Regions:
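Extended, Lys/Arg-enriched charged tracts that mediate electrostatic binding to polyanionic substrates
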Residues: 21
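Intrinsically disordered, low-complexity regulatory regions enriched in serine/threonine/proline
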Residues: 1-17, 26-127
Length: 127
């Protein structure tokens, strides 16, 4: 669980506004035992759930309703990046595979995109 503890600290720093301004709490943690370095975190507030995960090459964020189950399958969750592109009315860009970015940089890029648009994204899940 050491790897997940380190990842959790990074997520709490990179996405601090989710915890401090939008009342998200960490409610789920899973470290993949068969694949080194894989970690999945589940966040929740009164409106929705967010999964932030890392694999050996990817850091990503998915968002879903309160009834979506925290699991690697991500059933019931939607790509946070794709939803943000929809909100911003921009074409969804696939990552440039010529450049390798650390999971931390990938998550920081997502956070930079999410922060000014988080209210609109959360509105999609309000009843």
């Amino acid at each position: 669980m050491k790897k997940c503890a380190e990842f959790t600290e990074k997520v709490e720093t990179i996405f601090d506004y989710l915890f401090n301004e939008h009342d998200f709490v960490l409610v789920f943690t899973r470290e993949e035992t068969k694949r080194s370095g894989y970690c999945l975190l589940g966040l929740q507030n009164a409106v929705c759930r967010i999964v932030i995960y890392k694999t050996w090459s990817e850091g990503n964020l998915w968002i879903g309703p309160l009834n979506a189950a925290f699991d690697w399958a991500l059933e019931g969750f939607y790509s946070g990046g794709a939803l943000l592109m929809f909100i911003l009315k921009q074409d969804f860009q696939l990552p440039d595979f010529k450049e390798f970015h650390s999971t931390e940089i990938q998550l920081q890029n997502l956070s930079d995109l999410l922060k000014p648009n988080v209210e609109e994204l959360l509105d999609l899940f309000k009843e």
